[in-house]
Amino acid sequence: MVSLVVEHRWKEKNAQDAFKVVGSIIDMQKNGKLPSGFTLKSVNVVENERMAVCEWDAPSVDDFKGLLEKVNPPTKHEVYLSKRLL
């Protein structure tokens, strides 16, 4: 299991679609529908920067990147391995 921080950035024209994806992923987490081993820990949106920072637990970085490929959010995203201190 790894802890990840994922930074998403979108263009203004993609904002509505980006928020649809965020909403559906949050609903999947709330309803226990994410694939086994994946947990969305937090979502922080900085709207005036068209950015979201999400914290995840996942089986591996590669598994998470595979999930991102399937979801295909309308964002540019960076995935960072992180160490949770608090």
Where are the regions that the model predicts?
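Histidine-centered catalytic/metal-coordination loop motif
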Residues: 70
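Short S/T/G/P-rich N-terminal loop/turn motif that feeds into the first structured element of a domain
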Residues: 1-51, 59-66, 83-86
